[in-house]
A protein has these predicted regions:
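HIT superfamily nucleotide-processing domains
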Residues: 1-141
Length: 141
């Protein structure tokens, strides 16, 4: 089901044009209009899911399969020397369009692009790691 106000739903339905790389019945992939690098592509579900945590696993698997195809094409055709495959889930994680999508960002030697993951909390002591692991496990069970 589409969200009428969603930018990516409008692109997926053809209401807004894009530079399409790939499309099937469930997914569309297109060049990012504000690319981090040459070939930066977004892989977007056609059905509206707000973010990674709210998207069915089979859909996530398909999106990442398409992301892998695009990664391979960027390495082969654009001579990328690496690829970042990134999902931002939620506004606090940097998700600017609240529709599940994956960034495929081709990387090139010396491109100067950084992934700024600086620790924002004190490092956790090794004695606290089992407690943290158990907290997360509880949410899975």
């Amino acid at each position: 089901m589409a969200d009428n106000g969603c930018l990516f739903c409008k692109i997926a339905s053809g209401q807004i044009p894009c530079n399409k790389i790939y499309e099937d019945q469930d997914v569309i992939a297109f060049l990012d209009i504000n690319p981090a690098s040459k070939g930066h592509t977004l892989v977007v579900t056609k059905e509206h899911f707000q973010d990674f945590a709210k998207t069915p696993r089979d859909v996530i698997g398909h999106v990442y399969s398409v992301a892998q195809l695009i990664s391979q094409a960027c390495i082969k055709e654009l001579k990328a020397t690496g690829v970042n495959v990134i999902t931002n889930a939620g506004k606090s994680a940097g998700q600017s369009v609240l529709h599940f999508h994956v960034h495929v960002i081709p990387r090139y030697d010396g491109d100067g692009i950084g992934i700024p993951f600086e620790p924002s909390v004190p490092l956790i002591g090794s004695e606290q790691l089992p407690l943290l692991a158990n907290s997360i496990k509880k949410g899975i069970e």
